[in-house]
UniProtKB/Swiss-Prot annotation:
Pfam families: CTP_transf_like. GO terms for biological process: NAD biosynthetic process. It catalyses: nicotinate beta-D-ribonucleotide + ATP + H(+) = deamido-NAD(+) + diphosphate. This is Probable nicotinate-nucleotide adenylyltransferase. Belongs to the NadD family. Pathway: Cofactor biosynthesis; NAD(+) biosynthesis; deamido-NAD(+) from nicotinate D-ribonucleotide: step 1/1. One of its GO terms (molecular function) is ATP binding.
Amino acid sequence: MGGTFDPIHNGHLVAGSEVADLFDLDVVIYVPTGQPWQKKHKKVSAAEDRYLMTVVATASNPRFLVSRVDIDRGGDTYTVDTLADIRAEYPEAELFFITGADALQKIVTWRDWEKIFDLAHFVGVTRPGYELPKDDEGSDDPLSKEVAAGRLSLVEIPAMAISSTDVRERATSGRPVWYLVPDGVVQYIAKHGMYVSSE
């Protein structure tokens, strides 16, 4: 599962758990982005902080691992590179790439997006009420074509109604984030002064 994880929240964890169950996955590898190319105009917390929050959040689930592959590579993070690196590390594994369906809507802007469906089966997780692309080979929508080709599955996850943006905004304004993120992440945010307004 790739993501900025700024911060990782319970929706990410529920999504990983649900997808692992639905697709009978042995493990879910959370991969925090190093430099998210699509967020250059936004303030993003340091990669090391996002990595450590992800480690804290996933530690209690034996099916969850965290990879530094994007952070250690340096430079902008592109999914095609992430998948190639994970494939090199696990050459015999059948890979599934879990991401938000909202991110998938912008997939045609991703570097080498046509190649990424050859590297992994994509699973787009959605928030309730989100319109899922239809299984339609004749459609001009690239996502509908991938669904029809069996290279993309879409799964609705009720807990995905939580967003990292909302968590950051709540923390910045001094509102509680308990039960939106794991307890260890709440403590990490407080200890390291994450998302404190500079005003």
